[in-house]
Amino acid sequence: MSRVCQVTGKRPVTGNNRSHALNATKRRFLPNLHSHRFWVESEKRFVTLRVSAKGMRVIDKKGIDTVLSELRARGEKY
């Protein structure tokens, strides 16, 4: 399973660890992903999405029905 938020599209990015001597070693910054069940009142069922913390805030703001319709328009499975 890829580390991508289904709502926002956030994915891992790369950067550097910096030591006290400012040596740079490559590292990955991972999104804060969670598998979360959301109740969809219109379908009378739970839907499980892999979302970041920001994705959960987007769902709180827009509503789960709006977000699911956007996912359907993109052709993403949930």
Curated annotation (Swiss-Prot):
Q: Which UniProt keywords apply?
A: Ribonucleoprotein, Ribosomal protein
- Gene Ontology CC annotations of this record: cytosolic large ribosomal subunit
The record's annotation in Gene3D superfamilies points to: Ribosomal protein L28/L24
A Gene Ontology annotation in the biological process aspect, one of them, is: translation
Which segments does the entry list as coiled coil? none
- Alphabetized GO MF terms: structural constituent of ribosome
* NCBIfam families in the record: L28 (TIGR00009)
Similarity field: Belongs to the bacterial ribosomal protein bL28 family.
What is the name of the protein in this document?
Large ribosomal subunit protein bL28
According to its UniProt entry, this protein's organism is Enterobacter sp. (strain 638)
Q: What are the top taxonomic ranks of the organism?
A: Bacteria, Pseudomonadati, Pseudomonadota, Gammaproteobacteria, Enterobacterales
